[in-house]
Regions:
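A short, basic N-terminal segment
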Residues: 1-41, 266
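Short regulatory helix/loop adjacent to the ATP-binding pocket of P-loop NTPases
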Residues: 63-66, 166-181
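Conserved AAA+ ATPase "SRH/arginine-finger" region at the nucleotide-binding site
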Residues: 76-80, 170, 183-196
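Walker A/P-loop nucleotide-binding motif
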Residues: 41-61
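Conserved AAA+ ATPase "sensor/coupling" helix adjacent to the nucleotide-binding pocket
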Residues: 92-94, 164-165, 173, 194-210
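C-terminal alpha-helical "lid" subdomain
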Residues: 198, 205-267
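Mid-core helix/loop region of P-loop NTP-binding domains shared across ATPases and GTPases
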Residues: 82-85, 98-141, 150-154, 191-196, ...
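Conserved NTP-binding/hydrolysis module of P-loop NTPases
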Residues: 8-15, 71-73, 81-100
Length: 267
């Protein structure tokens, strides 16, 4: 309804935003820089954020930049797995015929990675999303999975993407060995008020709408209610646009944003 009223070609605040339309935040630049380094040197990287801050989207926009001719990427998002199921899913990602025993799966995966890195000269990257849900046994195995040639080669890059609690978990003594293998770490900060304002106006302009549709007070109210979460901000803005269209208003004010927030029960 609001798309037609505000002359939008699309809803720029929808979940299905393409990587090409990504708004360039400082968080996004920091994530890309760190993961670029990790993919060059190998090892394990840790990307954490509070829910809704855009960590998965940041990882996706980075992965979208990779050249499939020079980089083999395996993305895993089913993290609530047993140890054996984890290896089976990983083997499937590499296109390996799955063995029955864990030790055989482990060997076959490492041989595949070694072949890709040494024979085809490819970078090999595994992105594990929702990694805060990984079983303890899987986390402990990751350090062995990245151990090649008696720990003298780094053929594999593993990116752990998860909630902030994952960093707290890895700070415990049982994970000391894994923590020492972390090559890069980054905790996303979320959108500040200025970035949130620029984001909303930029996305409105890209959709064909008036970038100043929301006044400054409305944008400040939207940011204050989203807590830095881009997912929450998208929901608030979308709901405010719906309210504005229903009221046939070409101007979104703070009161509309507050109504939108209350309807979403975000307070």
């Amino acid at each position: 309804m609001f798309r037609q009223f505000y002359n939008m070609g699309k809803n720029p605040f929808s979940k299905g935003l393409s990587c090409a339309d990504a708004f360039k935040t400082d968080d996004l630049a920091q994530v890309h820089a760190r993961l670029d380094h990790l993919s060059r040197v190998g090892g394990i990287g840790l990307l954490t954020a509070d829910p809704g801050t855009g960590k998965t989207f940041a990882a996706r926009t980075w992965a979208d930049r990779l050249n499939p001719n020079t980089t083999k990427l395996v993305y895993m998002c089913m993290s609530t797995l047993t140890n054996n199921d984890f290896y089976r899913q990983l083997a499937r990602g590499f296109g390996i015929q799955m063995a029955y025993k864990k030790c055989d799966l482990f060997r076959d995966i490492q041989e595949c990675v070694r072949s890709l890195a040494c024979e085809r000269r490819m970078r090999v990257v595994v992105v594990i999303d929702e990694a805060h849900m990984l079983h303890t046994s899987v986390l402990r195995d990751l350090q062995m999975l990245t151990n090649f040639e008696m720990d003298s080669k780094d053929y594999l890059s593993v990116v752990l993407v998860g909630h902030s609690v994952l960093a707290q978990q890895l700070s415990r003594q049982p994970y000391e060995s894994l923590r020492q293998r972390l090559v890069v770490t980054y905790r996303m900060q979320g959108l500040g008020e200025a970035a949130a304002r620029d984001y909303v106006r930029s996305m409105l302009a890209r959709s064909g709408a008036d970038p100043d549709l929301f006044d400054d007070a409305a944008l400040a109210a939207a940011h204050g209610s989203c807590g830095g979460s881009i997912r929450r901000l998208n929901s608030i803005v979308t709901n405010a646009l719906t309210i504005g269209a229903q009221q046939k208003s070409m101007h979104i004010d703070a009161e509309m944003v507050r109504s939108a927030t209350e309807e979403l029960s975000l307070f």
